[in-house]
UniProtKB/Swiss-Prot annotation:
Hydrolyzes ribosome-free peptidyl-tRNAs (with 1 or more amino acids incorporated), which drop off the ribosome during protein synthesis, or as a result of ribosome stalling. Catalyzes the release of premature peptidyl moieties from peptidyl-tRNA molecules trapped in stalled 50S ribosomal subunits, and thus maintains levels of free tRNAs and 50S ribosomes. GO terms for cellular component: cytoplasm. The record marks N12 as: Discriminates between blocked and unblocked aminoacyl-tRNA. GO terms for molecular function: peptidyl-tRNA hydrolase activity; tRNA binding. Signal peptide: none annotated. Monomer. PROSITE patterns: PEPT_TRNA_HYDROL_1, PEPT_TRNA_HYDROL_2. GO terms for biological process: protein quality control for misfolded or incompletely synthesized proteins; rescue of stalled ribosome. It comes from the Bacteria. This is Peptidyl-tRNA hydrolase. Keywords: Cytoplasm, Hydrolase, RNA-binding, tRNA-binding. It comes from Proteus mirabilis (strain HI4320). The record marks D95 as: Stabilizes the basic form of H active site to accept a proton.
């Protein structure tokens, strides 16, 4: 496994979207920065908020794009090109409709599951899907016609607590990923349910 050099939290920009389910990836990156006594600062050349942390002796960049979700690839590509980071050295945290709140999974590669942020990142990397994904469960509204309103809605307190607990576990597993590797990280992460 390549070492992770860039961790991205997908989100829509602005206060109107800050607490919506679609911003779960940004919640994870914000908390990761806080736990390492860093704050994300806007950096226009990367079209997002960035920070730099040390994860178990590894120099890691953090990025929360300020583009809208469907243009996330622009920010990821800008930072990856500038720091010469390969797709398999990137972990993208995002909301996942196919997992319930309180569950989080990690994987390398795969499809985009209809997620516009992932879709745009893949297209910017010449349709290379081989980057890591941290899939933060937000649940599904049960009807595909209600998905847009659902992901752009704020979760009720009970669901928010489950999502927050899953993000806490994901943070612990990020340390394991960097220290002990992918297999150990997913063994722990995939057995967790808030």
């Amino acid at each position: 496994m390549s070492k992770i050099k860039l961790i991205v939290g997908l989100a829509n920009p602005g206060a109107d979207y800050a607490q919506t389910r679609h911003n779960a990836g940004a919640w994870y990156v914000d908390l990761l920065a806080q736990r390492h006594q860093q704050s994300l600062k806007e950096e226009s050349k990367f079209f997002g908020y960035t920070a730099r942390i040390n994860l178990n002796g590894n120099d890691v960049r953090l990025l929360v794009p300020t583009t809208f979700m469907n243009l996330s690839g622009k920010a990821v590509l800008a930072m990856a090109n500038f720091y010469r980071i390969q797709p398999d050295e990137i972990l993208v945290a995002h909301d996942e409709l196919d997992l319930p709140p309180g569950v989080v999974k990690m994987k390398l590669g795969g499809g985009n599951g209809g997620h516009n942020g992932l879709k745009d990142i893949q297209s910017k990397f010449s349709n290379n899907p081989n980057f890591y994904r941290l899939r933060i469960g937000i649940g599904h509204p049960g009807d595909k016609n209600k998905v847009v309103g659902f992901v752009l809605g704020k979760p009720p307190t009970s669901e928010q607590k489950l999502i927050d607990d899953a993000i806490d576990e994901a943070l612990a597993c990020t340390d394991i990923l960097m220290r002990d590797g992918y297999e150990k990280a997913i063994n722990r992460l995939h057995s967790f349910k808030a």
